[in-house]
């Protein structure tokens, strides 16, 4: 749709970027409006949904989306464990949304669930929790990882990764319900998920943490950095600051969730040192050769990312105070 509207705009002499921006804003507002009015109920016969840890931010988001879709939702928090068996006795689905470092422990503590109950977790690591759910429950099991923060406002175009545990035919409707909310689904095995998250989350968050720590130790003047920054540096600085506005326990859990993450970070540290050696030696040609090697590895993605980032930078610059 966007491509055809851009073509029409260009034919009429109207800036295509302007039309695309207006259409995207309309689409965002449409999803936001649905967030207020509600969504279609794909499984009206579903018994109550229990969210374990529903008082947390992601748990509250799923409670909201499920309630807007017409489902009855119950919350099971830490102080409710003495009533846990009663709360889940007739549950049609149980969603575990607790900190990573206690996810497997909480799954293991769950009382027996109805045999047809769908057991779901929302942790950002998948293999351990998925195995824990398969061991704790004989019924349908599904691993989810929402690839966005609970402050997103809307699930429109957000990615939700899913890992099959058991009996996918029983939870297929829930995946479709998530699509009704506007999200995009991506299926992957739990092992592959965790391997990729080592790069997407653990390494990236650690590098951001280290950069923020360096800025703080150097005691730079943030106001001056912002006043002097280019759009791309301002955006990068915003991403660093965003990390430190969130829960440190969450990021400690993500980064330290496996020995594999530590090994990857150590390899990154080693390559950082190798790059510094190029500077110490003043070897510009070696630097350029390494640069070209990485450019070749990125291939067509380099140009694609440049185009995408150009749009983001324009938007960031437009929003500059």
PLM regions: where:
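Long amphipathic alpha-helical segments
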Residues: 1-12, 24, 28-30
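A short, basic/flexible loop-to-alpha-helix module at the beginning of a structural domain
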Residues: 27-47, 82-85
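Conserved N-terminal Rossmann-fold NAD(P)-binding element of oxidoreductases
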Residues: 49-53
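Hydrophobic/small residue at the entry helix of a nucleotide-binding pocket
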Residues: 57-58
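Rossmann-fold NAD(P) dinucleotide-binding segment
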Residues: 85-133
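Rossmann-fold dinucleotide-binding core
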Residues: 125-188, 194-197
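Active-site-proximal catalytic alpha-helix in oxidoreductases
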Residues: 158, 172, 193-245
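Interdomain hinge/lid region at the active-site interface
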Residues: 226-301
């Amino acid at each position: 749709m966007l491509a055809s509207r851009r073509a029409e705009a260009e034919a009429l002499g109207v800036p295509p970027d302007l039309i695309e921006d207006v259409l995207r804003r309309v689409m965002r507002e449409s999803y936001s409006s649905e967030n207020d009015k509600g969504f279609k109920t794909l499984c009206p016969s579903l018994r109550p949904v229990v969210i374990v840890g529903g008082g947390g931010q992601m748990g509250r988001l799923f409670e909201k989306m499920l309630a807007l879709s017409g489902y009855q939702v119950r919350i099971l928090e830490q102080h409710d464990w003495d009533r846990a068996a009663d709360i889940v006795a007739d549950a049609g689905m149980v969603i575990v949304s607790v900190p990573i470092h206690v996810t497997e422990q909480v799954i293991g503590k769950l009382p027996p669930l109805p045999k047809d109950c769908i057991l779901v977790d929302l942790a950002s690591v998948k293999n351990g929790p998925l195995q824990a759910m398969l061991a704790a429950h004989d019924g349908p099991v599904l691993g989810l990882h929402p690839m966005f923060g609970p402050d997103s406002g809307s699930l429109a175009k957000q990615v939700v990764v899913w890992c099959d545990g058991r009996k996918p035919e029983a939870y297929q409707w829930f995946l479709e319900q998530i699509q009704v909310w506007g999200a995009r689904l991506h299926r992957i095995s739990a092992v592959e998920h965790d391997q990729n998250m080592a790069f997407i989350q653990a390494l990236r968050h650690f590098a951001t943490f280290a950069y923020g720590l360096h800025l703080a130790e150097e005691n730079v003047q943030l106001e001056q950095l912002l006043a002097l920054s280019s759009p791309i540096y301002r955006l990068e600085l915003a991403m660093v600051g965003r990390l430190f506005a969130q829960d440190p326990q969450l990021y400690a859990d993500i980064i330290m969730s496996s020995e594999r993450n530590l090994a990857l970070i150590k390899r990154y540290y080693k390559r950082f040192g190798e790059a510094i050696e190029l500077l110490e030696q003043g070897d510009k040609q070696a630097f350029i050769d390494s640069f070209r090697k990485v450019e070749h590895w990125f291939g067509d993605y380099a140009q694609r990312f440049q185009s995408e980032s150009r749009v983001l930078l324009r938007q960031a610059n437009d929003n500059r105070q």
